[in-house]
Design a protein with these regions (language model features):
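Bacterial N-terminal signal peptides that target proteins for export
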Residues: 1-9
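Bacterial N-terminal signal peptides
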Residues: 8-17
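N-terminal phosphate-binding caps/lids of nucleotide- and nucleic-acid-binding domains
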Residues: 20
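Mature catalytic domains of secreted/periplasmic carbohydrate-active enzymes
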Residues: 23-244
Length: 244
């Protein structure tokens, strides 16, 4: 069995390109040739890096603006669903999502007590053999110093390169480092931000996602039939590929 060499930074993709691959003839997808092709026979010739087979315990930091409301990692979506407890929570704490939505939560994430080096030392003492940082959740907010759009942790919130600082701390402690991305589902995941209350005094008043000034965060509105986990929207699929 061959063993693939481990690169200093590994991208652990939490999203898959299944839906995209079926339509590759429609997009510009310059995928570089690698050590194997997408067949079972090819994949059986490779195995995990030795260090990973021996690493029984690693730590993944699924951490971002979701820590402001402290109501789970899907808060950015559920605050736009009138039947959800997160909607009521948001209404009471920050106001109606037609004016105060996820875009207004992001700047509240300051990370003022975050000390990645101290945490990494603690993780290593706990027995961690590798560390993975989230790069972006379904909320389309990037945790690194991105040039792709303004919704990133250097331009907003903590004004720090979260992924970069995690990487430096992991490298200093001799831990292999990876990044997870969750953008594949973002386009349809965020479509509730384009809708409105169905009942009550603000029924049919659009949520803030309907404002085109924020489509670089919430995405443009999807076709009504586009409701799958992975969007059929070709523009989004190309954008996702380019970002990753």
């Amino acid at each position: 069995m061959k063993t693939r060499l481990f690169l200093p930074v590994v991208l652990f993709a939490a999203s898959f390109v299944t839906g995209l691959q079926a339509q590759t003839n429609k997009f510009d997808l310059p995928i570089a040739a690698g050590p194997f092709v997408g067949t079972t026979a090819s994949l059986t010739n490779y195995t995990y890096p030795k260090w990973f087979r021996d690493a029984k315990f690693g730590i993944w930091a699924h951490w971002g603006p979701q820590s402001v409301p402290m109501e789970g990692d899907w808060y950015a979506r559920k605050l736009y669903q009138q039947n959800q407890a997160d909607y009521t929570n948001h209404l009471e704490r920050w106001g109606h999502p037609s004016t105060n939505g996820w875009k207004d939560i992001i700047p509240l994430w300051k990370a003022e007590n975050w000390d990645p080096e101290k945490l990494m030392e603690l993780y290593k003492k706990a027995g961690a053999k590798y560390f993975v940082s989230m790069g972006s959740h379904h909320d389309n907010f990037f945790l690194w110093n991105s040039k792709l759009h303004r919704w990133n942790a250097v331009q907003m919130g903590p004004h720090r390169d979260v992924v970069g600082e995690w990487q430096k701390a992991a490298t200093k402690n001799g831990l292999p480092f990876g990044v997870s991305e969750h953008l594949g589902a973002s386009f349809t995941w965020f479509q509730d931000a384009h809708r409105s209350d169905r009942t009550g005094p603000l029924a049919v008043v659009p949520y803030d996602g309907a404002n085109s000034n924020y489509w670089d965060l919430y995405h443009p509105p999807a076709d009504p039939t586009d409701r799958g986990w992975y969007s059929k929207n070709p523009q989004w699929q190309q954008e996702w590929f380019n970002e990753i």
